[in-house]
Swiss-Prot record:
Encoding gene per record: RXLR126
Organism: Plasmopara viticola
Secretion signal, residue range per the UniProt entry: 1-20
Lineage top rank: taxon: Eukaryota
Family indicated by similarity: Belongs to the RxLR effector family.
Motif extent (RxLR-dEER): 50-64
Protein name per Swiss-Prot or TrEMBL: Secreted RxLR effector protein 126
Role description: Secreted effector that completely suppresses the host cell death induced by cell death-inducing proteins.
Subcellular location per the Swiss-Prot or TrEMBL entry: Secreted; Host membrane
Keywords: Host membrane, Membrane, Secreted, Signal, Virulence
Domain notes: The RxLR-dEER motif acts to carry the protein into the host cell cytoplasm through binding to cell surface phosphatidylinositol-3-phosphate.
GO cellular component: extracellular region; host cell membrane; membrane
Length: 193
């Protein structure tokens, strides 16, 4: 029991030192994608993010694994900071300025998480609706294309039918004319004798 406090203090310092270093690195990555500090580490960070994202069947990017992992990491870091702060407060090592700074940090952390969630939801909503509009336009275009091709086929068929009927009528008229001419010349021969 008497070693429990020492173990807790040691664990708190191990967690807090690990979380403070990783918090600085993550903040640099998130805040400065193109700066010289985060440029060396940023590609692996974003590659990991892309690897954890999955593509849905309809083309929407569904971020399944990454937000859960990111949220878990954020909660672990915040838990470490809370534990470190509580340990310092327990031993009376926190000044009023330090308390205010920690409360401001907690508020900023909540605000950042809320903004990230809101950004993801808005992005997903826009992707979903834009994709829906895109699919509707594509379907409309294919329907119009099919209607135009059907109309063209009907027009071709009607044109061929009208050409055939006109040809048959002309042929019949010519045959009638030939028969009349033959009859006329037969009658003329009869009258000639």
């Amino acid at each position: 029991m008497r070693y429990l406090l020492a173990v807790l203090i040691a664990a708190a310092f191990v967690i807090s030192s690990g979380t403070s270093v990783s918090t600085i690195a993550d903040d640099e990555l998130i805040l400065s994608k193109d700066t010289t500090i985060g440029a060396a580490v940023a590609p692996t960070f974003h590659d990991d993010k892309r690897m954890l994202q999955t593509k849905a069947v309809n083309g929407l990017e569904e971020e399944r694994g990454w937000p859960l992992l990111e949220t878990g990491i954020g909660k672990i870091k915040m838990g470490g900071k809370k534990f470190k702060h509580a340990t310092k407060r327990m031993f009376g090592m926190v000044s009023p300025a330090g308390e205010a700074k920690f409360e401001a940090y907690k508020g900023l952390h909540k605000l950042k998480r809320g903004l990230i969630r809101m950004y993801r939801r808005v992005k997903w909503w826009f992707q979903k609706n834009i994709l829906r509009q895109k699919h509707a336009l594509e379907e409309g275009a294919t329907r119009a294309k099919h209607k135009v091709s059907e109309a063209n086929q009907k027009l071709k068929h009607r044109t061929k039918e009208s050409e055939k009927t006109a040809y048959h009528r002309l042929k019949e008229a010519f045959q009638k004319f030939r028969h009349r001419m033959k009859d006329f010349f037969k009658k003329m021969r009869v009258y000639a004798y």
